[in-house]
């Protein structure tokens, strides 16, 4: 069922201008987060226009919303309140947990208010999982893409006797941060800033912890001797027999562009997990952890991973799946500053103006209406094929018959040419036809670089910059709009 869309009413007026400005600002912010190649200094987005050509919409199905749309985020608690302006947000907000819960998990506070208990390896594993962004062993991309700031740890409470922060872990972290042979049993994590417990400017609270640290010396020394015998190095525990922890899960596609391997946070967690396994004898033939008196500590089972809170389904909730075809004149204006390396590196920068004058789009959109929220996303080509492929074959039987006839005649020709090998090499079934290709099939762009002299551009070799900008536009669209990512609008 096809529907008519009043494109002019939806994209013009104050509301249309405000939406266009928000899209421009969103794309501009995304370009500021992209690592630029050496020959590009900066990329700025100046304007965005919807154009005058409306997309073609064909409703394929009306069904119940996807389960992912019912996951409740912090911002959803005010959905029944009053006086809230319409706003949109991506599904990455759903991955953010409350700061108080993370702090309690890190410093060992439980629901009963006990913040001084015997540290075991399960507690520390939960601590390292928190740093990775998840509580079930899988990493969750944090909205903040920078490593953990050292300022959060520069306080007197973060020391080797703090619950859940174990000796050896700080030593290993110190090794990773180029600390040399500073031992975690004598130096708190704050020593990475360049100080020591006996250096100038160190808080007096840490200087007075000598009596407390003496009680734990016996048990700690036993574990350090065990590490020294295995590795021969007092400052770097062995990770030779430790399997790396799985810190990524799910697609990446969407995250093909996410550089998790270069994230310092991921490297930090890999080290801490290895240190935990070495310290507590989790290797093959290792011993169980002991307290300061030499008694074995009973290992508690970790609590089950918390499941996301789901909204309650209502009879009025519905979802529309539609085919979207667009070959319009949407406009996007960008400026990229190119660096010239002659006669010296980064000698001068030339502005390259890129104007995207239109795109060709063919995909499947999903719009779910739940309470006062509308969720919008697009399906990947694989999901669209699985959902609508059979239906397209029914609607276009002649195309499918032609493909079958061609495949049959091709198989007959192969059999005539290879009669002797027909038994050894059976015919392979024909590959299924892809109904949907790339979502953004074509992007039309005009470029202008430098000053024009006599109607001609000073430089014309701008192909690399154009390809980079267009690739980033495709990546931003696929990362932010393709399911399981989606946008939410308050209606």
Swiss-Prot record:
For this UniProt record, give its keywords in alphabetical order, as a comma-separated list. Endoplasmic reticulum, Lipid transport, Lipid-binding, Membrane, Mitochondrion, Mitochondrion outer membrane, Transport
Residue ranges of the region described as Disordered: 72-123, 201-313, 389-434
Fill in the subunit field for this protein.
Answer: Component of the ER-mitochondria encounter structure (ERMES) or MDM complex, composed of mmm1, mdm10, mdm12 and mdm34. A mmm1 homodimer associates with one molecule of mdm12 on each side in a pairwise head-to-tail manner, and the SMP-LTD domains of mmm1 and mdm12 generate a continuous hydrophobic tunnel for phospholipid trafficking.
* Record's GO cellular component terms: endoplasmic reticulum membrane; ERMES complex
Instruction: Give one GO biological process term.
Output: phospholipid transport
Per the record, the similarity remark reads: Belongs to the MDM12 family.
Please describe what this protein does.
Component of the ERMES/MDM complex, which serves as a molecular tether to connect the endoplasmic reticulum (ER) and mitochondria. Components of this complex are involved in the control of mitochondrial shape and protein biogenesis, and function in nonvesicular lipid trafficking between the ER and mitochondria. Mdm12 is required for the interaction of the ER-resident membrane protein mmm1 and the outer mitochondrial membrane-resident beta-barrel protein mdm10.
Keyword Protein biosynthesis appears in the UniProt entry: no
Q: Spans of biased composition, class Low complexity?
A: 252-262, 400-421
| Sequence ranges of Polar residues compositional bias | 230-249, 270-279
Q: Where is the SMP-LTD domain?
A: 1-491
The domain comment in this protein's record states: The SMP-LTD domain is a barrel-like domain that can bind various types of glycerophospholipids in its interior and mediate their transfer between two adjacent bilayers.
A Gene Ontology molecular function term for this protein is: lipid binding
Question: Which segments show compositional bias classed as Basic and acidic residues?
Answer: 83-123, 213-229
**Compositional bias (Acidic residues) at which positions?**
72-82
Q: Which organism is it from?
A: Talaromyces stipitatus (strain ATCC 10500 / CBS 375.48 / QM 6759 / NRRL 1006) (Penicillium stipitatum)
- What InterPro entries has UniProt attached to this entry? Mdm12 (IPR027532), MMM1_dom (IPR019411), SMP_LBD (IPR031468)
Q: What is this protein called?
A: Mitochondrial distribution and morphology protein 12
Q: How does it sit in the membrane?
A: Peripheral membrane protein
Subcellular localization(s) per the UniProt record: Mitochondrion outer membrane; Endoplasmic reticulum membrane
